[in-house]
């Protein structure tokens, strides 16, 4: 807002399970019950009840300091239904962290609930409006960097960062090292660890403890990767995989970046075999 960059509301989150024949989007009652038969489907109605109950009960975990209860155990103790786990909790968590759905039940329940609480996701009727930058993130980057754009070095990969008394030495590839007063490493933790010439034991322990996984990403126009009902289409579209495997998502870039195009441009993670 301070950069006076235009935004628009774009984020919603539907789930599509081709095997179970289920799809829904929680943005409205009409989208939630886009499949009218879900009005009479006991498992779906049970999932909706469990969502409301979870939103009411889960915040109590935040008052239990030091609780390391796994998410799966917390849900089992609360007797939450299978549909709630498979078609709500796991898809939401796997999509947020782009992680293997099978690992979600091992997440610390308190961490999971705190994230949902901090982002206003433990309520149904008063959720915050998630917004996207009009024209993409490049717009605010342009405005943010205007005062110092002439000092930005592009296409200059850094090989090493070395601490010196009273400063830091940065060694770009194929260039002489440059001394700075201070350096911020705005990159992934494993990359930061790889750049440090002399990491401390604490830095090795912390930066080396965060795992990453690769995701296969494809840009395409195959709308079969979106839910069957256009009413359910959204910026993020989660695919339930019957045989497990890494998280499978399709991002609708026309929605996320407000592309004025007759054909939907889609980005799919880890579901390449389904793309025509």
Task: Please give the residue ranges for each predicted region.
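N-terminal glycine-rich dinucleotide-binding loop that anchors FAD/FMN and/or NAD(P) in oxidoreductases
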Residues: 1
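Mobile amphipathic helical/loop "lid" adjacent to a hydrophobic cofactor/ligand pocket
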Residues: 4-114
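Short, basic and Ser/Thr-rich N-terminal targeting/leader segments
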Residues: 8-11, 154, 213
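Hydrophobic/aromatic-lined pockets within catalytic cores
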Residues: 79-80, 93-101, 145, 149, ...
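Helical element adjacent to the flavin cofactor pocket in flavoenzyme catalytic cores
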Residues: 112-173, 178-181
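Mid-domain catalytic core of redox enzymes
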Residues: 156-276
């Amino acid at each position: 807002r301070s950069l006076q960059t235009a935004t628009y509301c774009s984020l919603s989150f539907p789930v599509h399970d081709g095997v179970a024949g289920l799809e829904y989007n929680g943005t409205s009652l009409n989208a939630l019950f886009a499949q009218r038969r879900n009005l009479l489907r006991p498992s779906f109605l049970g999932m909706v009840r469990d969502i409301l109950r979870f939103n009411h009960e889960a915040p109590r975990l935040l008052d239990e300091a030091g609780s390391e209860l796994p998410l799966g155990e917390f849900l089992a103790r609360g007797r939450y239904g299978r549909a709630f786990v498979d078609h709500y909790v796991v898809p939401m968590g796997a999509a947020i962290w782009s992680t293997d759905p099978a690992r979600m039940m091992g997440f610390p329940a308190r961490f999971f609930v705190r994230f949902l609480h901090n982002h206003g996701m433990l309520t149904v009727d008063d959720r915050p409006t998630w917004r996207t930058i009009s024209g993409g993130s490049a717009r605010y980057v342009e405005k943010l960097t205007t005062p110092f754009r002439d000092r930005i070095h592009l296409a200059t990969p850094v090989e090493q960062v070395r601490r010196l008394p009273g400063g830091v030495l940065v060694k770009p590839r194929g260039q002489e090292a440059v001394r700075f007063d201070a350096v911020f490493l705005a990159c992934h933790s494993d990359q930061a660890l790889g750049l440090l010439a002399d990491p401390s034991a604490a830095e090795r322990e912390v930066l080396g403890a965060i795992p990453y996984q690769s995701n296969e990403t494809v840009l395409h126009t195959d709308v079969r990767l979106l839910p069957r009902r256009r009413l359910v289409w959204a910026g993020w579209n989660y695919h339930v995989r019957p045989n497990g495997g890494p998280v499978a998502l399709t991002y609708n870039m026309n929605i996320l970046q407000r592309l004025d195009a007759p054909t939907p441009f889609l980005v799919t993670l880890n579901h390449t075999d389904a793309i025509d």
